Amino acid sequence: MTSHRIRHEKARVDFGRPISFHFDGKSYTGYAGDTLASALLANGVRMLGRSFKYGRPRGIVGAGAEEPNALTQVETGAATIPNLKATQVELYDGLTARRTTGWPALDFDLKSVSGRFSRFMPAGFYYKTFQSRALWPKFEHVIRQAAGYGSAPEEADLDSYDHSHRHAEVVVVGGGPCGLLTALNLGRAGLNVTLLDEQRELGGWLLSSPHAIIDGQPGYDWLKDIIGELRSLPRVQIFTRTSAFALHDLNLIQAVEQLQDHLPLAERSETSPRQRLHRIRASHIVLATGAIERPLVFGNNDLPGILTASALTTYLNRYGVAVGRRVVLQTSNDFAYQGACDLARAGCSVVLADTRTRPNTVWEQRAHAAGVDVRPGYAISGALGSRAVKAAKLVKISADQNSISGDGPTIECDALGSSGGLSP
């Protein structure tokens, strides 16, 4: 088991509150504040699914809404919900979840055999292959099963749901530092402000950045102070666990608030709504939704154990989980350096391949001081492994960064991260 906990006081989980849960029929333990994804990684679970066409192993890539792979079926019977991202499922006692891909089992998916015949299976081949009307019902069942999406509930939903209509002078979407400061300044001016954030606690990227300093204060202290003042302002309303999903004409925003999804089934109230739909008409809207890190492209970059660099840092700093002990990072910018330093200080062996021949000198010196092996002018050409990443093949980049100038070493690793910059 290469994934493991690294307990530190800055983690946003309560290590004094263990939580039992089940995934794919096996029992695991996490902690209050974990997501299903962080708890699975902490228990060494790497492969969470299979790809649609060739049944290639799939693992966790991100740490939030950007996650493309880790779709799960949560709970059973009338309470079941399909296609929830493990990175967005809050862990609670007794949670039951399973993977949605891999048949007959995740460890052995019959679709994996089809990879040997890939040249006979071009994109969209199934549209021209399965044309018999008489046999289509059978083909359809197999194709839908191969797609790997969850199953809709077959029983009536026993939960109740609510909706509300609201008006606000300003709606701020996003509870990171930018959104918090915007809401605070508007609230101080006496405006009617509604602040929406999808996570269980406010803070955004700051929750994964324990070393941040804002206005001369440690980031966590600054966050505590600003949230306290926001909650004291009479015309500011804060909604956490609330996702804004639609923007209509005339500044009408729709958002869904999860009221009980984070509670154990036995603790959910039958007389209270499970979720609430908010329809908010605003005079002005501020989108402070942050940015998503772009991964870099190389061979086999879909293997389990390969994440974005920011996801590796989030699991370490926010959840106290080291995805691997031997980490290789690839970056084209300065953003990955802090994460590399954090991983090295946590006891991981870290190699940082920077595609730039002349990285930022300050960050390079900080990384060396933290014990990071920085390799300027190198890139990853491919990852090695079958069910999980085992090594990374490096190549030398030319001075103009437009071509490969030579071979590089192959470095063994159990986790790999990449950073190609940020997109809003």
Describe each region flagged by the PLM.
Residues 2-424:
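Residues forming the flavin
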